[in-house]
């Protein structure tokens, strides 16, 4: 499994309800149709200022292919307008093991 970890702050004019609404639209219209997509989790930090999304993919290649297709997202401008300019960071993780 491969994970994209995206950190960000919301733009000043965006609230969490709008973020979740737009995320739902992105899932329905685009992301769920991407080969290798598993799930997208949105988290808020304990002080409520920073957000972290974890997007799960079957493989690194599936994640990279989806990234190349991001220009085809029907309402990409609405999605990207949620993020405060300059606040986005990302990293990628390859899962080695999982224990319960």
What are these regions (language model features)?
Residues 73-77:
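A common structural junction motif
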Residues 1-51, 58-71, 82-100:
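Short S/T/G/P-rich N-terminal loop/turn motif that feeds into the first structured element of a domain
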């Amino acid at each position: 499994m491969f994970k994209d970890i995206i950190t960000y702050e919301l733009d000043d004019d965006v609230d969490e309800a709008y973020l979740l609404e737009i995320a739902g639209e992105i899932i329905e219209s685009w992301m769920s149709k991407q080969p290798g997509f598993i799930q997208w989790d949105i988290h808020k930090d304990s002080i409520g200022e920073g957000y972290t999304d974890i997007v799960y993919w079957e493989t690194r290649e599936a994640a990279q292919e989806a990234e190349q297709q991001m220009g085809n997202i029907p309402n990409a401008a609405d999605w990207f307008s949620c993020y405060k300019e300059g606040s986005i960071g990302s990293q990628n993780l390859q899962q080695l093991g999982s224990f319960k």
